[in-house]
């Protein structure tokens, strides 16, 4: 049995793994770690990060690697090398845009510095938000004939793209107006 471990909140990094496995009805156990417990538990995990997956009593980590594993098990990864490149680009895009917004989140959550968080978030909106979503839209436009799925059939790429777009359009990220997606009409249509 597969065991997935993450914090006690939903986030795309764990959700894409759970959605892959659930989509194909692959059983798994889900363990949530409370944020207050994390400093004590951190050293128990590879790279000191979550998510972690345990298979056959061995720990594995890094979101992209775990996503490939779960997607392969769930038949949501491809065997065609060029389709794999498209899927991996979407997974890497998700990680990159998260890396760009992360400083504004850390300023609020860890440092409790709301003024710094607001400044960093505004910089992200001005410099990165539209840019990174236009990158994703261009990938969809150039890789998909039907504009419904990145590889023209449902895959982990679609799960990851949908989940990250959902996060940015959820209203949970301060200062980010969900209407930003109007600037990328192909992507907006894909998401809706």
Language-model-detected regions and their locations in the chain:
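GST-like domain detector, emphasizing the conserved glutathione-binding G-site
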Residues: 1-123, 127-130, 142-144, 153
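Alpha-helical structural motif
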Residues: 83, 121, 132, 183-190
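GST superfamily/GST-like fold recognition
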Residues: 87, 149-188
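Alpha-helical packing segments of well-folded alpha/beta enzyme cores
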Residues: 125-136, 164, 190
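Extended, charge-enriched "interface" segments that sit outside catalytic cores
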Residues: 139
